[in-house]
Every structure is written in C-alpha cells, then in structure tokens.
C-alpha cells in the first residue's frame, strides 16, 4: 500500500513539474472562455424563454 502511495505521489510530482507549452495553455484558456460564454448565453436564453 505504501508503495502505491509513493508511486502516485511521485507521478503527481512529475506531472506538476512538467512545464506546459505556452500554446497549449493559450488553447485551454480560449476553450474555457468559450465554454463560459456559451454557458452564459444558454442561461440568458433559458431566462428569456421562461419570462415570455
């Protein structure tokens, strides 16, 4: 059990030390922003439909 914990801990540490490429980070940010905008638009549409 300790070995598994140690392996997972070292894997997490290794994953966190890997530097993400700037392009990948930019893409993730853009995706997140787009997702937020779409969610807000859908919410507004739902509210308008309920009010009508």
UniProtKB/Swiss-Prot annotation:
List the membrane topology term(s): Single-pass membrane protein
Q: Name one GO molecular function term.
A: protein homodimerization activity
Phosphothreonine modifications at: 17
Modified residue annotations for Phosphoserine: 16
PTM per UniProt? Answer: Phosphorylation by PKA abolishes the inhibition of ATP2A2-mediated calcium uptake. Phosphorylated at Thr-17 by CaMK2, and in response to beta-adrenergic stimulation. Phosphorylation by DMPK may stimulate sarcoplasmic reticulum calcium uptake in cardiomyocytes. Palmitoylated by ZDHHC16, promoting formation of the homopentamer.
Q: Where are the transmembrane segments?
A: 31-51
Q: Where in the cell is it found?
A: Endoplasmic reticulum membrane; Sarcoplasmic reticulum membrane; Mitochondrion membrane; Membrane
In terms of superkingdom, the source organism counts as Eukaryota
Lipid attachment points (S-palmitoyl cysteine): 36
- List N-acetylmethionine occurrences by residue: 1
The residue ranges for the Cytoplasmic side of the membrane come to 1-30
Record's GO cellular component terms: endoplasmic reticulum membrane; membrane; mitochondrial membrane; sarcoplasmic reticulum; sarcoplasmic reticulum membrane
Query: Which processes are annotated in GO (biological process)?
Result: acrosome assembly; circadian sleep/wake cycle, sleep; intracellular calcium ion homeostasis; locomotor rhythm; negative regulation of ATPase-coupled calcium transmembrane transporter activity; negative regulation of calcium ion import into sarcoplasmic reticulum; negative regulation of heart rate; visual learning
Keyword Plastid on this protein? Answer: no
Q: Where is the signal peptide?
A: none
Q: Which CDD domains match?
A: Phospholamban
Please give the function described in this protein's UniProt entry.
Answer: Reversibly inhibits the activity of ATP2A2/SERCA2 in cardiac sarcoplasmic reticulum by decreasing the apparent affinity of the ATPase for Ca(2+). Binds preferentially to the ATP-bound E1 conformational form of ATP2A2 which predominates at low Ca(2+) concentrations during the diastolic phase of the cardiac cycle. Inhibits ATP2A2 Ca(2+) affinity by disrupting its allosteric activation by ATP. Modulates the contractility of the heart muscle in response to physiological stimuli via its effects on ATP2A2.
- Family per UniProt? Belongs to the phospholamban family.
Q: How does it assemble?
A: Homopentamer. Can also form heterooligomers with other sarcoplasmic/endoplasmic reticulum calcium ATPase (SERCA) regulators ARLN, ERLN, SLN and STRIT1/DWORF. Monomer. Interacts with HAX1. Interacts as a monomer with ATP2A2; the interaction decreases ATP2A2 Ca(2+) affinity. Interacts with VMP1; VMP1 competes with PLN and SLN to prevent them from forming an inhibitory complex with ATP2A2. Interacts with S100A1 in a Ca(2+)-dependent manner.
Name of the protein described by the UniProt record: Phospholamban
Q: Which organism is it from?
A: Bos taurus (Bovine)
Q: What is the name of the gene encoding this protein?
A: PLN
């Amino acid at each position: 059990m300790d070995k598994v914990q140690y392996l997972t801990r070292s894997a997490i540490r290794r994953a966190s030390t890997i530097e993400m490429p700037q392009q990948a980070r930019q893409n993730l940010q853009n995706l997140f922003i787009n997702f937020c905008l779409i969610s807000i638009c859908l919410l507004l549409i739902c509210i308008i439909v309920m009010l009508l």
